[in-house]
From Swiss-Prot:
Keyword check for Secreted: yes
Key words of the record: Disulfide bond, Knottin, Secreted, Toxin
Protein name listed in UniProt: Mu-segestritoxin-Sf1b
Domain of life per record: Eukaryota
Length: 46
């Protein structure tokens, strides 16, 4: 499966395309409103 590289901004509609997890500025859990505004980035696999 194609996936986005680490440090790529992940939005709510594409967070499952990260190679690892989608991490937000306020912690490891991607909250919907943070993902809508582009505050989250792909991170390493857990």
């Amino acid at each position: 499966k194609e996936c986005m590289a680490d440090e790529t901004v992940c939005y709510i509609h594409n967070h499952n395309n990260c190679c690892g997890s989608c991490l937000c500025l306020n912690g490891p859990y991607a909250r919907p409103w943070e993902m809508l505004v582009g505050n989250c980035k792909c991170g390493p696999k857990e």
